[in-house]
Amino acid sequence: MKKNILENKTILLGVTGSIAAYKAPLLVRELIKKGAKVHVLMTKSATEFTTPLIMANLSRNKVIVDMFDAESQTSGAWHIELAHNCDAMLIAPCTATTLGKLANSICDTPLVSVAIALPTEIPLLVSPAMDSTMWIHPATQRSLELVRQDGALIIPPVEGDLSSGFVGPGRFPDIEDIVTVLEETLKNSSETRYETNVTYSKNDNIINNDDSPLNHIFDNATEPIEESISKDKWNAELDYELLKKKSNL
């Protein structure tokens, strides 16, 4: 029987004020179904798209929105305690605002405070979601690169229909794909080295990893060639992120 890597794992889920936050309850439900213990942190903007009550009911844990909420003050440094007692933190969706705060250690929300307090051995996964023009803006890309350099695994957005009515990059990935990336990250972080056959050329940044499960996420899809190309690129970016995480182990 295949081992469920998420069983009894403590996952911190950060939810920010992207319109994609309305999908966050589905993400919580999927993690709970796989046996994870989920603690949700929300920015105040995120509460405009889904409610702490919904997230608390699904996660079966109190949701933290306010840094100084009296019920959250279970210890002198509750955010440190929370950060040091989890198996991974996932910020999904992540806005350009929170991405910028992560890049510059602006800890004015519980979500960012906990993310910055994570020990380096605990994986931080960030799934940005925003409109295309915001995603490709140089400021967003600078923040993205800084967060990446600091050790976070970036789950890149996909191309598709956006809430603005435009079509382009910035769309929140499918829930099952985000969960798969989290599972693979936990699996790899629990090993002293990766067992997959990976080759990397510094000259041309080519990644060749035929054995990676990420390459098979979309194997059974029947879709237009444009979407297939976009998803192949998405998988390649994820493999690259995982390879860089390996080099830091």
Where are the regions a protein language model picked out?
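A cross-family phosphate/adenosyl-ligand binding-site feature
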Residues: 1-126, 132-249
